[in-house]
Structure formats: C-alpha cells, structure tokens
Amino acid sequence: MNDYMRATLAGLLILSSLFTSQAAEFSQIRPDEETLSELPTTNWLTNGGDLFNRNFSALTEINTGNVNQLGPVWRIHLDGSGIGAKYSGEAQPIVYEGVMYIITGADDVFALSIETGKVLWRYSANLSDEISTVCCGWTSRGVGFGEDKIFVGQLDGILKALDKDSGAEVWSIQAEAWEEGYTITSAPLYFQGMVITGFSGAEFAARGRVKAYSAEDGSLLWTFYTVPGPDEFGHDTWPADNDAWQTGGGTVWHTPAVDPELGMIYFSTGNPGPDYNGSERAGDNLFTASIVALDAYTGDYRWHFQEVHHDIWDYDAPNPVVLFDLDYNGVPRKGLAQAGKTGWLYILDRTNGEPLVGIEERPVPQEPRQATSATQPYPSGEAFVTQTLDVAPEGYRLINNGAIFTPFWEEPVMLRRGDANWPPSTVDQGKGVMYVCAGERQAAYSVRENLQQARPGDRYTGGGMRFASIPITGILSAMDLRSNRKLWSQRWPNRCYSGLVATAGDLLFAGRNDGRITALDARDGSKLWEFMTDAGVNAPATIFEHNGKQYVTVFSAGNLLGRAKRGDSVWLFTLLDEEEDAIALAQANLEGQGLFQNTCQFCHGRNGEGGHDGMPLEGLAAFDSSYVADIIRSGQNNMPAFASMFSASQIRALAEHVRTLNPDIPNRNSR
C-alpha cells in the first residue's frame, strides 16, 4: 500500500468516525422535533400532547356517535401516593410504546402497563415534610420524556432524569432551592436534547426564571430571568431607587410551547411580588403577567406582550400558551393564544408578538398609593367570563361595579375574579376554536402597609384577597380564534378545574370536581357521556391509540383548591361491546360507589345505614338490578327521581352498588 492509499484510507476512517459520532449524537435526540410537532396518535409524548400545547388528538374512532359506549378497561391504585389534605392530582399521563408514566402530588412516579394496568416500576421522591414555600398545595402537572428518560421536576427544586424502563436515576441536580422560594410544579419539556423548565414561587419573594439543561447529563445550558436585572432590557420598568426586581416574582407555572420552524419557545408569567402592594415597585414590572418569546436554543429575548401592567390583583397568566396556524382574512398566520386571569383571550402573531385580533390600551381607575398604571390592554371581542358584579355580596359595597382593574388600598374592595388558572385550554385548529376551562369568583382585595424588605423564601404578598361566601361557579367556553367571540358557553355548579382535551371526533373531554369524567359535543357543549370515578378528576385526560384501538386515560386524585375528594387512581377507558361491558360490571360497582358517595350518602348514610330523611338500604340483593334501577330512575316515597340527573349506565352502576349494601339484613319488603 503506497503513501497515497494510506492517506486516503486514513481520511476515510476519520470521516467515517465523524459521521458515526454525529449519527450517534443525532440518534440520541428522540423524539425529534418533527415527531413532537405532530398531533399525537399512538403516543402522547409531552404535556399538552405536542410542542404547540394544543391538547388535541387527531383520533376519530371514539366520536360523538359512539362515545356512549365508552367504558372502563382497568383502574389501578398508586399505593396511596399523594392522598392527603395538602396534595392535588393534576398530572396529565404521558404514553410511550405501551407504557404510561404518571406522577402524583407527592412527586412519586409510576410506570404502568397499558395492557394490564400493572405497575412496572415506581420511583419515590421522599419529599421532606419541611418544604414550606408552596403556594397552592403539593402537586405536579406531569413528567417529561426524551432520549429514553423520564424527566421529573420536584417541589424541593430538584430536577432529575429516570431510566424509562427501570425508573433508575440517571442524573439529578439541585436546580433551585425551595428554601429560597423556588419549587417545580410544571412538567419539564424535552426539545432537541434540552430539558426546559420554569419555577414556581412568586408568593415567596422569588425572581422568575426559565432554565434549559442538557438531557444527557443535566448540565445547565441557558437561563432567562423574567424580571430583568441592571443593564438588561426591561429593567427600566422597575424602580431605580430600590432592589424590588430581586424579589419581583414573574414565575413560570406551566410547560412552555415551541415552534421548531421559528426556533422560538413561548411561555406566560406569574404575578409581580409582592402580589397586592404596588407601592414599592412603580412601573410596568416587566416581564410579569406577560407572554414571552425566546430563542429556544440560547434563551435570548425575542419579544413580549404584557397582559397586565403593574399587576396588583394577581391577574397573572398561569394558563399554558397554545400555538396554532390559521388563516386571517385569507392570509396564513402563525398564531398564539393565552387565556388570562383577566377573563380575556390574548391572540397574537407568534413571529413578533403583535395582536392578530385587536387589543387597545384604555384608561383605568387610579390609586396613586398603588402606583397604578394609567392604562391596561383591552382585547376586542368578548371575555370568556363576566368581569363585573351586579350585586354586592353581604357585608361589602360595590365600587366601579366590582370591575376588573379597580384599584384598592387598606379598605377591602370587592371585585370580580373570573379567570383561567393552570388547567390547560385546548385548540381545534381545523375549527379555529379554543376551549377554555375557567371559574367565576369574587374577592375583596386590600393591602398591608409598611412592607419590610423580603428575603427569597419569605412569604411576600403585601396584602390579602378574601373570597366572598358565594359559591364559585365554573365556566366552559368555546372561543372563535378569528373574532375572539364566544361560540358557546356554559356555567357549571362548581369550578372548572381539570383542563380540557379535544379530539377530531368532535369530542371535548373534561374532568369534574365531584369525580366525573365527561365527554361533550365540541360543537355545542352538549353532554354525551360521563363516568363517575372514585375521586375528583382534576387533571386533563390523555388520548392515544394502542394496538389499533383508541383509549382515554385520566388521573383521578382530587384537588386542594377544587375542594375535591382525594384519591390515587388511574382509569383507562375504551369502546366496549356487550360482552366486554359485562366484564366491566365489576368496574361499574366502582362507578356506583362513587355516585353513591357523592349523591346518596347524605340521605342514606355512608354505608346505607340510613340518615337525614333517608331510609336504611338493607337486603336489596333480594331484588334484581332492573327493579332497583327503576326505583332510582323514577323515585319512591320521599326520594326524588334521578332519571334526568344520571345516565342509564350510571343508574345501572348505582343499582349494582346499593344491592351490595347490608346484604345480611333482610329487606322488609322481601318477606
């Protein structure tokens, strides 16, 4: 072999080595941006379903014509993890290749077999009971997935990666310290070899931030502070004579969205700190209560839109941003929408942050002691909730009709507080519709004067917000993304606090605080199916296909702020034929038990022993199910008819349950 041939061979070997190395590097980036950008089908790979946060499934096997045949395949308990007064179950399950990954309010992670519901592995976080910088209950909204790892953000500020097959720890870092006010409640986002997360803590003198880490080893790649420091763009919206920016809030509650084509990442931010006293933080207080766009690879600022200037009402923006592509006046546009605590949708061009549907600055009432902003942004169209009060609650007088943006000082001022909180919205891009899950409340605001400089980790609200003793109601609204007007809207008897998932089968799935999972017709909001689980359904559903069949799964674990019964169950549903329906009767008893506990026990007692105005339920096994179901359906003696309240399948489930109560005591009517 001559020197030329040796040199040529050496060069080829070097090139081959480089190509092999690059191929190995790129093969590690999975799922890739193309997969994560597609509407989910066989898997559900990220919180929100895709990088656009659409919470939309392209599957159609389950649709408006057959959803009434939906039934439980299995239910699994998660070893009692996250059951307790301080916990909430808000996590959306992730699904990959026949395995489901779910995290509880205790930050314990479970891998479940789709086929059987069997627990394949469990990771226990063993959180310290000393964690005290938690705003709104111990919770997690999900895990991230990528490169054969499950990414977990914990309340103690730890971010870690677990092996997807075994649950073994791959790496762990102390991303932030809970003692300084920082916790992680959102699902981490995997994108192009990065794990990206925000941090909660605006009520604890925190300075908001988003960080990106290497998915391979957890090393820090970039940081963006949502409250700018000296010499950074936006710092001039904070006072020059103090260090209010250091404890300025603006934390990020939710999983961001990404547009890979533009190379931008998007999120919205929390309230400034302190929440209710603006006297020490004059200025607009960027980038709090804002939508922010960054370069996804570097974390560099690209644009922002502030929804509330100098927020003193806790009108921040915890609802996840959603991306969509839609024609406006015949021109294709890249859109972004966010449902604010103000009760408005903010619909923007995600390339530059300019409104796609008009937003104008309007003068608002002033309170000099609060250093209030002279104007606030008012989107055109309609709000998805009411923004004023028509009657003053007992013990209060109305100022400015209780309208949003009414300022306050020491004397409590009652205002409308209709909002979209963390429960995610969903977008049907084909229809050009965004569905929003919200609540309507009213609260009296007041400040606490003589603020002392807070240290990170101190409770730092600067006042208070007291809710009126009036029931909180839920609002579910379908909003036209082109006009920002309501297509339909409905009021629920309690707060909408689960998040939403829509499908190409014209369905909208929503959980309820009383334990129901419901399927609505997305076109008009009519209820088509519901199932009573054993605890509050306060997490968005996940929809996927496995072995050619469509499934719906939901975490039924309850919620602190939703005042929902706690639990530890994951439920899996699919379309059942008659034979499978018979097999599911055991699960129907679980549904019947839930219905009984939420409706019947108040009169008949928890175990059917009798109670207020209700006779004992004894020995009903002596009668067949159809007889008992007829009584429930039509009513008897002082018991009202439930035909209009419960579906036929629910009545059957309830009948099956009450027949199991006190079976050894003869029924007086069976003698």
What are the residue ranges of the model-derived segments?
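Blade/loop signatures of beta-propeller domains
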Residues: 29-73, 226-233, 393-404, 465-466, ...
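Repeat-blade elements of multi-bladed beta-propeller folds
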Residues: 44-48, 86-108, 133-158, 183-204, ...
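Electrostatic cytochrome c docking/interface patches
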Residues: 29-31, 578-595, 668-671
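Gly/Gly-Pro-rich "capping" loops immediately C-terminal to redox-active cysteine motifs
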Residues: 593, 602-638, 642-645
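Repeat-solenoid scaffold signature
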Residues: 183-216, 310-372, 384, 404, ...
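C-terminal capping alpha-helices of c-type cytochrome domains
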Residues: 579, 588, 632, 644-671
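Beta-propeller blade signature
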Residues: 209-219, 284-298, 474-480, 568-576
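Extracytoplasmic beta-rich repeat domains
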Residues: 76-92, 122-144, 172-187, 204, ...
